[in-house]
Amino acid sequence: MIENNELYLQTLGQNAKQASYGLASLTGTQKKALLSAIAASLTAKSQAILAANQKDVAAARENGLSEAMIDRLLLDDARLKGVISDIDNVISLNDPVGTELESQLLDNGLRLSRRRVPLGVIGVIYEARPNVTVDIAVLALKTGNAVILRGGKETLNSNMALSEAIREAITEQGLAADSVQLIKSPDRTLVSGLLKLDQFVDMIVPRGGQNLQRLCAEQATIPVILGGIGICHLYMDKDANIAKSIEVIANAKVQRPTVCNALDTVLIHDSLAETALPQLFSNLSAQGVSFYGCEQTKAIADKLGLAISTATDETYGQEWLSLTLGIKVVADIDTAIGHIRRYSSGHSEGILTDNIHASAHFINQVDSAAVYVNASTRFTDGGQFGLGAEVAVSTQKLHARGPMGLEALTTYKWIGLGEYTVRG
């Protein structure tokens, strides 16, 4: 029980800021050694971590959480090994810190350059996924940043086990353990307090649902990177290959339906509906998918003896995070684009077509962080993009957009080198 939330947060902030000064001076070699030590520590403590996660899973079932939520918080042996493997991927990435972005010699003799540097202290608020604890810590440390983590109460045991393993490795490398700090109390007022800790924290990244995003946008006095809500669309154009398109749709919907880059709505050109929808229903129904469709979609389903729900404005604006799919038949590509503009969260959209002009038009007119041609929305991921583990998927346009990798955790400073140069 924390007696004084304000003092607690001030202490976290001060310790993180102090730790960030040491991290900013680390060489690339030192950072690699640090991340290797973290991977080794997580491996050595894997059984304790999995046991802690089982406590969270058991509590979630007892509290009646949905299977989708339980899947999000689950850490089994394979997933934990995958998380640790991702650390090796980050180790192999080029360190952006210290990169000289540009340099010029001014007429007055001043050598002016722009150099990439750490942000300083990052606050990350997230829900359910314990792997985020490791992903964020590793990316922050790789870029010389300290981090304050606030996970969901559903994964508190998992997050404590993971963060302690990380902090132990940091200490073994002769660095401040408070380079990575976890808020261990589920008290929601601590979230509001963290959002106002602008004296110490340089950026807030919320990873969670609409309520969390809204809370951060409304209360933060620190720059906030919003995103992570994925209302994702695929449009099957009149010139699409139906069989191949259905394979892509199935992958986008079924492979892992509980994540933000999973497909939520399919838009189908009217000329393909009678042929494509029966095949789509057959494929996805066999994999447990249920449907919400427009009137034309329902009419086709009725002919097949398939009962589906009626789509509404509310359902088209739904991030399903489950084996549920919205379907709408559209007259043309511009109607599809109009639907996406209305309902999309700006995360990931795609067009399925063999028409190069249609794909170019779609790319230019759809304003989302990731736009695909003949590919699954499931690719919107830091690992898939070659960024290593990601901090978040930003749906904003300033500072970072799409999967946020290492560079998104840096800023730059101007450096002027003179010969006791004065301004004339």
UniProtKB/Swiss-Prot annotation:
Q: Does the keyword NADP apply?
A: yes
- Kindly state a single biological-process term from the GO annotations of this entry: L-proline biosynthetic process
- Give compartment(s): Cytoplasm
Instruction: Please write the reaction equations for the catalytic activity of this protein.
Output: L-glutamate 5-semialdehyde + phosphate + NADP(+) = L-glutamyl 5-phosphate + NADPH + H(+)
- CDD domains xref list: ALDH_F18-19_ProA-GPR
- Give GO cellular component annotations, separated by semicolons: cytoplasm
Q: Which InterPro entries match?
A: Ald_DH/histidinol_DH (IPR016161), Ald_DH_C (IPR016163), Ald_DH_N (IPR016162), Aldehyde_DH_dom (IPR015590), G-glutamylP_reductase_CS (IPR020593), Glu-5-SA_DH (IPR012134), GPR_dom (IPR000965)
- Segments crossing the lipid bilayer: none
Q: What is its EC number?
A: 1.2.1.41
Please give the PROSITE patterns that the UniProt record associates with this protein. PROA
> Which pathway or pathways does this protein act in?
Amino-acid biosynthesis; L-proline biosynthesis; L-glutamate 5-semialdehyde from L-glutamate: step 2/2
Protein keywords: Amino-acid biosynthesis, Cytoplasm, NADP, Oxidoreductase, Proline biosynthesis
Gene Ontology MF annotations: glutamate-5-semialdehyde dehydrogenase activity; NADP binding
Summarize the protein's role.
Catalyzes the NADPH-dependent reduction of L-glutamate 5-phosphate into L-glutamate 5-semialdehyde and phosphate. The product spontaneously undergoes cyclization to form 1-pyrroline-5-carboxylate.
What the entry lists under HAMAP family is as follows:
ProA
For this chain, the family text in UniProt reads: Belongs to the gamma-glutamyl phosphate reductase family.
Q: What is this protein called?
A: Gamma-glutamyl phosphate reductase
Instruction: Give the originating organism.
Output: Shewanella woodyi (strain ATCC 51908 / MS32)
